[in-house]
Amino acid sequence: MLLSDRDIKAELTAGRLGLEPFEQGMIQPSSVDVRLDRFFRLFDNHKYPFIDPAEDQPDLTRFVEVVADQPFILHPGEFVLGSTFELVSLPDDVAARLEGKSSLGRLGLLTHSTAGFIDPGFSGHVTLELSNVATLPIKLWPGMKIGQMCFFRLSSAAEKPYGSAEYSSRYQGQRGPTASRSFLNFHRTDVSGTEAGRSSS
């Protein structure tokens, strides 16, 4: 069930849902606007010949902090990691989804490339996957509205929410944009037994 503005306010008041720092004016009819922090991670294209999700590549990105009153310039075709200004904390029975702002999308800014879903139990600053698909550079101002977060109540509380000992929960408690940690639980299925155009069953 998608939470309404009334539901979101009730969850915040009860302390079950956390958004820090929070401003009342950020609440929309069924979402909450989130803002851009001043921290970014830029890809260094000269450190590795290719990106391999199975390998630890610690120098793939470099950390950049911009002055709070100055913009970060995102060039056409560029992809960087950013993060929400807000620290987001979810209870065990609420999941969230980050969506871009329509007005920014019409300028060619993509807020997240794929990872918009946030598991129940998560706590941290949400990493943004920012892309410029326009033909001109885009100024990204720290503190600007960068996306909107909607919340979904689960039919029951998660048995093992994000952050549980059973899961690696690689991004729990993250501060600022966090580089990929896909190598920590990389999984690859053996597909050698299948033939093209035929089902394995």
From Swiss-Prot:
Residues 166-183 have a biased composition (Polar residues). It catalyses: dCTP + 2 H2O = dUMP + NH4(+) + diphosphate. It comes from the Bacteria. One of its GO terms (biological process) is dUTP biosynthetic process. Its EC number is 3.5.4.30. Keywords: Hydrolase, Nucleotide metabolism, Nucleotide-binding. DCTP binds at residues 101-106, 119, 127-129, 148, 162, 174. Gene3D superfamilies: 2.70.40.10. Residues 166-201 are annotated as: Disordered. The active site is at 129 (proton donor/acceptor). GO terms for molecular function: dCTP deaminase (dUMP-forming) activity; dCTP deaminase activity; nucleotide binding. Pfam families: DCD. Pathway: Pyrimidine metabolism; dUMP biosynthesis; dUMP from dCTP: step 1/1. The record marks 116-117 as: Important for bifunctional activity. Belongs to the dCTP deaminase family. Homotrimer. Bifunctional enzyme that catalyzes both the deamination of dCTP to dUTP and the hydrolysis of dUTP to dUMP without releasing the toxic dUTP intermediate. This is dCTP deaminase, dUMP-forming. The lineage of its organism: Bacteria, Bacillati, Actinomycetota, Actinomycetes, Micrococcales. The gene is dcd.
